[in-house]
Amino acid sequence: MNDQRSPLELRPSQSVIGAEIPHDSAELHVSGEALYTDDLAEPVSTLHVALGVSPIPHGQLKTIDLAATRAAPGVVLVLTAADIPGENDVGPIVHDDPIFAENIVQFAGQPVFAVAANHVNAARRAARLAHIAIDPLPALLTIEDAMAAQSYVLPPAHVTRGDPARALAEAPRRIAGTAQVGGQDHFYLEGQIALAIPGENRGMHIYTSTQHPGEVQQMVARALGIAAHDVVVECRRMGGGFGGKETQMSMFACIAALVAMKTGRAAKLRLDRDDDMRSTGKRHAFAYRYDVGFDDDGRILGLDLTLASRCGFSADLSGPVNDRAVFHADNCYWLPDVAIHSYRCKTHTVSDTAFRGFGGPQGMFAIELIIDEIARALRRDPLDV
């Protein structure tokens, strides 16, 4: 005899399946009592940090005149690459991502120096007083620029199955085309922020909004030239991340920690929205080129597909992001004879990074576009192809 009760009625009494379980911080969120990094009590004499950044995308860094910045009211410390005791790098995989630009600037908004002052507004005003002399160099700003120059942050990758050239040549129908999708800012409500508090024996405690505390710990230790176990990183909660705080937070935590180490005082670096959007990576923009062969029923017989992404000036996570775009390029379709070419383009723009989907949406976009184009050529509904 069949039991007519629903699955929820049949579940054990202690089961959490189907049960209403409130989010751990739900009441704090709706009441406004949830604490984020900027809500934490600041130690007495906390310094506030602002960044001086490159105004152009590519150039030779000649001189940095910081005299007016150092003399500005409230300024306690100014830092450049020369003041880093450890490594000037926060690259998560490839070591090509400097904390401060050194000798060359590679994107508009790249940090060149930092100012620490007794008040955040004093630091920001002082940062604007610096004179940075840069000899401009030609800038590659688009995917097309980078492809023409064969400029890549990582070597191209190629995946082939079957004989796509033969399949395309023998296909009864064939179309080719191009497409592009743009990047996207994460626009988390809580911007990038770090509060570094120096401890005993060169130790450092950092409160920050990050998706990867372990990576921040390693990067700060490398920059300060101390052991990783001397760095504690704490993230109570984030006001949004979406991939934008996976690797990007490390640089700002390192700068706050450098100020704290140099002065022996707590240091907070909190980007305003404009600086955040200018100096942090986005979703990767992609350009596509495809050549597809198919039959009268819309069945794909052969495909040659090129995926080229704008990675920015450094590798960051562009390797795995582009790999995943390749892995998702077939989506749910069978491609018997296919060649996929992935180009990870180096441009003089901010280094793009992780974003929800991590390359998957960009990969699936291409094949869904191709399905739509096949349907249009056959005058059929895409759902019938």
Where in the sequence are the language-model features?
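Solvent-exposed alpha-helices and their adjacent loops that cap or buttress functional pockets
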Residues: P22, A41-S45, P98-I99, I104-G109, ...
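Short, surface-exposed loop/turn segments at secondary-structure boundaries that line and modulate
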Residues: L79-Q110, S151-Y152, E215, V233-C254, ...
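Flexible, low-hydrophobicity surface segments
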Residues: M1-V159, R174-G177
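Glycine-rich loop/linker segments at domain edges
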Residues: A19, S25-L28, G32, V159-A194, ...
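Beta-strand segments within the central parallel beta-sheet cores of soluble alpha/beta enzyme folds
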Residues: T80-A81, D230-R236, G264-D274, L301-T306, ...
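Alpha-helical support elements that line or immediately flank enzyme active sites
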Residues: L51-L79, F113-A133, A194-T263, P320-D330, ...
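Helix-loop-helix junctions that connect adjacent transmembrane helices in secondary transporters/permeases
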Residues: D145-L224, L383
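Phosphate/diphosphate-binding loops
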Residues: P111, A117-H119, M261-F313
